A protein has these predicted regions:
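Extended catalytic cores of very large enzyme megasubunits
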Residues: 1-809
Length: 809
């Protein structure tokens, strides 16, 4: 393929014009102790402290890089793409270091993609490979786009540094022969895919079965990826087993997987485990599945309340004994000690087990005066939540059109046994729907997946139905396939009051190629996933920061203009991605599964094109028609036309050459990579807050307005002075001088001196709320007690409001 330069120039560094600076990155515990510190993090000067922290703390390879490297000459490969390894002078057990500069990471990623792209025949010449290498590095450095986290973690460790390790049981398909091959090392073929869908057979210990799935999941979690599985093939509780027993059912096995994921999340090298669990609406155990997290969260509530109640009531028993002023033996006798009798009655009334009451009385006889009973709390990472199950996955119920029609008609719904297909139970569809709604309201799970709608847009139905998704549900395809993601930062393509459509299209083309190359170079956790991912080559290009872009342009997120522009941008990206896929297919051939699915895929592409033209009718094979593009309300006429032409090209090129990829785009949440790109909003969601806290390089935080707000106000016609006033109002003035109500004069009347006022002024700019400034840590305990007349018990009370005490209600 021919690669044009748009951001860089031949003969110049990819980083020309980009200034770099050195920053300090730290992680501190709440008590101030340092967990991680790197004082020499080199990043582009325009990057925020948050973005700098993300790349330093999450994406830098922290150890194992040989201090001395040498290039390995490789026949037929351009010199700038030669691999590196520890130099012969380095020796066994030589000094190793970690990455300290962002350029090392950018070079590692882009170099690896270019290396494998060259070997796979994706570039027409060395000039094109060099252009690709430079353009990709530039986009990474300028935060125009980013690949999913596993790429940052794994890609290029072998190519750039010669890092390797023993095989972890992965497989890949050799791009030269098409032969399935067991990986001989951990990193030569990296694991760049974030999203996996895995199957699970109704088999306990064989390959492809239940226990094998936990091993496959562990391989994914170890390298930072996530996985989803539809478990509906597993028989329900009480169904017959071949050996004559009864099945423990779906939930028993889900709890094993949940516990395994919970253990791996804290022992892995990169991040927490990401896991999706799916159950069909007709599974015999679906009701237990729906209410799983609801019941577990009720257990947490019981643990928290019960532990606090035990701690209070048991110590009340001790208090009743300790305050007795008579004979010691009578102190432990409820007949003689009325206070003890009342305390015992209170404990019994709260259902404190008699064994614990007896234990306290025995302790008292031995001279103990109190008991430490560990109390729990509702923090998501607490011991209480670690005790219950169901906390390590997203849960979804998969519903069909038939189920939704049964809900609408208030009809019966049958739950079907997996062993013989007979009815296990009949209930009202609305009852099941109500359970789903209540559970989602109570604990945010389960979600809903619309089986028939998803499969109506399936490009490869000849190879089976789509039954599941990855953990975040943006990727839906065949079982035992994988998707590697990348996101384009939309706001980075908005300059001087207009969206740079040509730059956006250029970036879309190059990132589509990058994701395709990543399929070729990847290894996978099982033979089945390696084969099917190679055969279908699904990609996950998406965007981030749509909320920030719309705000900067002055369009409401929920406005007709905002929705129209979002739709058009999505259409352009997806159309160009499929056009690029067809161009790649022209050079190296379509994906192996394309032949028998060609008519289906072209039907899906025609439906996309129809929607891109804004058509209400004319769709093929769809029971539910999509919402078409709203060209009339799109504020950018050029983008509107590009949305149509990109799909014209996607269809015409596909009809001639086929497609290299069965899917090309998704809209992912872009959590961590959204932060490394300094996105105001991640994924497709609106901004969650106009005012935020910016992390400072030297530590601490500073209250700021979302950087899109001043730009949006300027676009809407506000003057500079008006914008300053609005920003100050939103952020707060950070001072009590001349403030209404609470100011230096009103505080001086209450006894505040110059020292106390100076302390308030110093604390106010970074305060989340004015109440967080007025406390004894800021003002001093002696001032609060001696001058303001506040008791020590009031100061230690977490619910005490000092401002209200001073009369500022």
């Amino acid at each position: 393929m021919r690669i044009k330069r748009r951001f860089t120039k031949a003969g110049r560094s990819a980083y020309a014009g980009i200034r770099f600076t050195t920053r300090t990155s730290e992680i501190r515990n709440p008590d101030g102790t340092v967990v991680f510190s790197n004082g020499s993090v080199e990043v582009p000067e325009g990057w925020s402290q948050v973005a700098s922290d993300i790349i330093a703390q999450k994406y830098f390879r922290k150890a194992g890089i040989p201090a001395q490297l040498e290039r390995i000459e490789e026949k037929g490969v351009p010199e700038f793409l030669w691999r590196s390894r520890a130099s012969r002078d380095h020796g066994e057990g030589g000094t190793t270091v970690g990455e300290t500069g962002a350029r090392q990471v950018f070079d590692r990623l882009a170099g690896t993609w270019a290396y494998w792209g060259w070997k796979g025949g994706y570039f027409s010449s060395q000039k094109d490979a060099r252009a690709y290498f430079d353009e990709m590095r530039y986009m990474l450095a300028t935060q125009r786009a980013a690949p999913n986290s596993p790429q940052w973690f794994n890609t290029g460790l072998h190519w750039a540094y010669g890092i390797d390790g023993p095989s972890q049981g992965h497989h890949y398909v050799d791009y030269r022969t098409g032969r399935l091959t067991r990986s001989g090392s951990a990193y030569e073929h990296p694991q760049p895919h974030a999203c996996f869908i895995q199957s699970c057979a109704d088999d306990l210990v064989n390959d492809g079965g239940i226990m094998d799935l936990w091993v496959r999941e562990a391989r994914l979690f170890k390298y930072g990826s996530g996985t989803g599985t539809n478990f509906s093939r597993l028989r329900g509780e009480g169904e017959a087993l071949s050996g004559g027993g009864r099945s423990s059912g779906l939930m028993g096995f889900l709890k094993i997987g949940d516990r395994a994921a919970g253990a791996i999340k804290s022992g892995g090298t990169t991040r927490r485990a990401a896991k999706m669990v799916i159950c069909d609406a007709d599974h015999p155990d679906v009701e237990s599945f729906i209410n799983w997290k609801v019941r577990e969260e009720q257990k947490v509530a019981s643990l928290v309340a019960g532990s606090k109640m035990h701690e209070a009531r048991l110590n009340e028993i001790f208090a009743a004994i300790n305050t007795w002023d008579g004979v010691h033996e009578d102190a432990i006798d409820p007949a003689a000690n009325p206070a003890l009798k009342a305390a015992l009655r209170a404990a019994k009334g709260c259902a404190i087990p008699e064994a614990y009451v007896k234990r306290v009385l025995d302790y008292a006889r031995q001279g103990y005066t109190s008991i430490e009973f560990p109390t729990q709390n509702t923090d998501w990472d607490s011991e209480a939540y670690g005790t219950v199950s169901g906390q390590n996955s997203n849960n979804s119920v998969r519903v069909t059109d038939a189920f939704l029609e049964a809900v609408a008609d208030d009809a019966d719904w049958a739950l079907i046994r997996r062993t013989d297909g007979k009815v296990a139970k009949v209930l009202k569809a609305r009852d099941l729907w109500e359970q789903i709604g209540h559970a989602a309201w109570a604990c945010a799970d389960p979600g809903i997946q619309y089986h028939d709608t998803v499969n109506a847009w399936h490009t490869c139905p000849e190879d089976g139905e789509i039954r599941g998704s990855n953990p975040c549900s943006e990727y839906m395809f065949l079982d035992d396939t994988a998707c590697n993601l990348a996101s384009i930062n939309l706001l980075a393509f908005y300059r001087d009051g207009r969206f740079m459509a040509e730059d956006y299209i250029h970036a879309t083309r190059l990132w589509t190629l990058t994701l395709e190359i990543s399929v070729m170079m990847a290894q996978f956790p099982s033979k089945e996933i390696a084969r099917r991912s190679y055969d279908f080559r699904t990609l996950g290009l998406g965007f981030a920061n749509i909320g920030g872009l719309l705000m900067t342009m002055g369009h409401g997120y929920d406005s007709v203009e905002g929705r129209a522009l979002c739709g058009v941008l999505t259409a352009v990206m997806t159309g160009v991605a499929y056009s690029t896929s067809a161009e790649i297919s022209r050079e190296v051939g379509p994906f192996p599964g394309y032949g028998k699915n060609a008519s289906h895929m072209l039907r899906v592409i025609r439906n996309h094109r129809n929607a891109a033209y804004g058509m209400a009718d004319g769709y093929e094979g769809l029971a539910v028609r999509p919402v078409p593009l709203d060209h009339a309300n799109c504020p950018d006429a050029k983008l509107s036309e590009l949305a149509k032409s990109s799909w014209d090209e996607a269809l015409s090129l596909g009809e001639r050459h086929g497609y290299r990829n069965a899917q090309a785009t998704v809209i992912a949440p872009t959590g961590t990579i959204g932060l490394v790109m300094d996105c105001d909003t991640t994924g497709i969601e609106p901004d969650f807050a106009l005012v935020k806290f910016k992390k400072l390089a030297g530590g601490g935080y500073f209250k700021i307005i979302n950087r899109s707000v001043p730009a949006a106000l300027g676009t809407l016609g506000y003057s500079t002075s008006q914008i300053e006033d609005i920003v100050s109002y939103a952020v707060g003035h950070g001072t009590f001088r001349s403030a209404p109500g609470i100011n230096h004069d009103s505080l001086a009347d209450l006894g505040f001196g110059a020292k106390e006022l100076d302390r308030l002024e110093a604390a106010s700019p970074s305060a989340f709320d004015i109440r967080f400034v007025f406390n004894h840590w800021t003002l001093g305990e002696r001032f609060c007690t001696d001058t303001l007349g506040i008791s020590a018990s009031q100061l230690s009370d977490q619910g005490f409001d000092l401002l209200r005490h001073l009369g500022f209600g």
